[in-house]
Amino acid sequence: MADESSDAAGEPQPAPAPVRRRSSANYRAYATEPHAKKKSKISASRKLQLKTLMLQIAKQEMEREAEERRGEKGRVLRTRCQPLELDGLGFEELQDLCRQLHARVDKVDEERYDVEAKVTKNITEIADLTQKIYDLRGKFKRPTLRRVRISADAMMQALLGTRAKESLDLRAHLKQVKKEDIEKENREVGDWRKNIDALSGMEGRKKKFEG
């Protein structure tokens, strides 16, 4: 018994099998096995009813805001454009009243001009900031491009500039041979037998045999 216990103690015991977590096993089973889709708790008619109700509420809010704007505009007009009292006024008083009205009109025009300048400045700043954001994100607005037919020469001219003409002119470095020189060379090549006969003295003897 002692020997068996010593042998058992000396042998290495096998490593235990890895234990899988239930979460991964459940996820694998959920992904592989078919399962029915969950039904929505709200029916289609109920969804349509809720959408209609939301649209009605939004319409009421818009109408209320428009009514508030109209009321604010009327209040401002009543404050700034008070009714004129012209009864019992003389000529000079009417002239003074006209001058006052013209001064008020000029003041309102100045205020309107200042407000328009501020609005334009704000719009420009917003556009600049938006462009900076696009630049930082790396999202550039691509312009609309149209197809243009271009020849190979024009393409090389656009790419290489002044060097395009030099690169395309491939015959510039070749030796130019005139037509007269070619005819002269052909004539000389064709008469080589006559030249040999004249040099060897055989020209006169050929004439005797031919005669």
From Swiss-Prot:
Family matches, as InterPro entries: Troponin, Troponin-I_N, Troponin_I, Troponin_sf
Post-translational changes noted in the entry: Phosphorylated at Ser-23 and Ser-24 by PRKD1; phosphorylation reduces myofilament calcium sensitivity. Phosphorylated preferentially at Thr-32. Phosphorylation by STK4/MST1 alters its binding affinity to TNNC1 (cardiac Tn-C) and TNNT2 (cardiac Tn-T). Phosphorylated at Ser-43 and Ser-45 by PRKCE; phosphorylation increases myocardium contractile dysfunction.
Statement: the UniProt record of this protein carries the keyword Phosphoprotein: yes
Segments for region (Involved in binding TNC and actin): 130-151
Signal peptide: none
GO molecular function annotations of the record: actin filament binding; calcium channel inhibitor activity; calcium-dependent protein binding; protein domain specific binding; protein kinase binding; troponin C binding; troponin T binding
Record GO biological process: cardiac muscle contraction; heart development; intracellular calcium ion homeostasis; muscle filament sliding; regulation of cardiac muscle contraction by calcium ion signaling; regulation of muscle contraction; regulation of smooth muscle contraction; regulation of systemic arterial blood pressure by ischemic conditions
Domain of life: Eukaryota
Family, as annotated: Belongs to the troponin I family.
Protein name as catalogued: Troponin I, cardiac muscle
The species this protein was found in: Mus musculus (Mouse)
